[in-house]
């Protein structure tokens, strides 16, 4: 990678020596997750209602504005950007933003990646790789096509498999993400593990999070991953390893397959003490914590002037409000989410 300094449009100068932002608890903020759209071509039962009301398209930042915002964060020490949604690849002309951000790799940005449901991968995989994307996360909760249809409501299992094939053929490494749902897919996790490891992919299992109103009762879906790990250890030898990808997963090595298995446990063993990330929505709202409602409006600063001084000041002020941890709780006595906004707005 080169270490040149450059400026793109009115965006902030990009430099590899930018010092990371430090929050009130001494954590360096080096990771930006950008939800480029709240729209999705699936309606996963744990994520959103089937008849979702999405943001008016006129409220979304333009791709050029998202590029400028990302550039400001890179100038302030962010070295990893993940594009999320909704489903990021359904955003019109999204590859424009991917190309612009990919051009910043080596100029302050170390890695550009994305989380996807895989539905659009078959047509975008080669170009994603050409733009510098080397790793992606694909959400896949089951290998049973009928159950896949049930949980996604609108999803096409074969299309996702084609997308995984295309991404691997293009040279992109894949990590599968599976949300563990009690009495739905918990018995399938061993098969998902064998499938992933058999194809050279990591697997991460995730506890369901209480975000947004859905038709399902999350207390019925919730499965502590400590229970899942105990079940897996009846079949596999799991050894804790010191492996980090910049995210919250804690990894083990599976002796029988040789592959890695990650656990993301926001409910039973939160990852707040090492949190290095903030989340930007497609409307320019910055959430300093996934599980808190406090937010900063960066759109106003972005549009106030072509100079980035005001934007940088707004980002700095927001980081001073990054909390120590989230407020997630699964509580059957209060049948409401801990955070009202849906994951598709915040970016999962």
Swiss-Prot record:
Domain of life the protein comes from: Bacteria
SMART domains: Elp3
Reactions catalysed according to its record: GTP + AH2 + S-adenosyl-L-methionine = (8S)-3',8-cyclo-7,8-dihydroguanosine 5'-triphosphate + 5'-deoxyadenosine + L-methionine + A + H(+)
Cofactor descriptive note: Binds 2 [4Fe-4S] clusters. Binds 1 [4Fe-4S] cluster coordinated with 3 cysteines and an exchangeable S-adenosyl-L-methionine and 1 [4Fe-4S] cluster coordinated with 3 cysteines and the GTP-derived substrate.
CDD domains membership: Radical_SAM, Twitch_MoaA
Record GO biological process: Mo-molybdopterin cofactor biosynthetic process
Annotated GTP binding sites: 33, 82, 115, 175, 277-279
EC assignment: 4.1.99.22
InterPro entries: Aldolase_TIM, Elp3/MiaA/NifB-like_rSAM, MoaA, MoaA_NifB_PqqE_Fe-S-bd_CS, MoaA_twitch, MoCo_biosynth_MoaA/MoaC, rSAM
UniProt keyword terms in alphabetical order: 4Fe-4S, GTP-binding, Iron, Iron-sulfur, Lyase, Metal-binding, Molybdenum cofactor biosynthesis, Nucleotide-binding, S-adenosyl-L-methionine
Gene Ontology molecular functions: 4 iron, 4 sulfur cluster binding; cyclic pyranopterin monophosphate synthase activity; GTP 3',8'-cyclase activity; GTP binding; metal ion binding; S-adenosyl-L-methionine binding
Pfam family, one: Mob_synth_C
Known cofactor(s): [4Fe-4S] cluster
Domain spans labelled Radical SAM core: 24-248
Residues annotated to bind [4Fe-4S] cluster 2: 272, 275, 289
UniProt pathway: Cofactor biosynthesis; molybdopterin biosynthesis
Ranges in a coiled coil: none
HAMAP family linked: MoaA_B
Description of how the protein assembles with itself and partners: Monomer and homodimer.
Family according to the record: Belongs to the radical SAM superfamily. MoaA family.
Name this protein carries in UniProt: GTP 3',8-cyclase
Organism for this UniProt entry: Rhizobium etli (strain ATCC 51251 / DSM 11541 / JCM 21823 / NBRC 15573 / CFN 42)
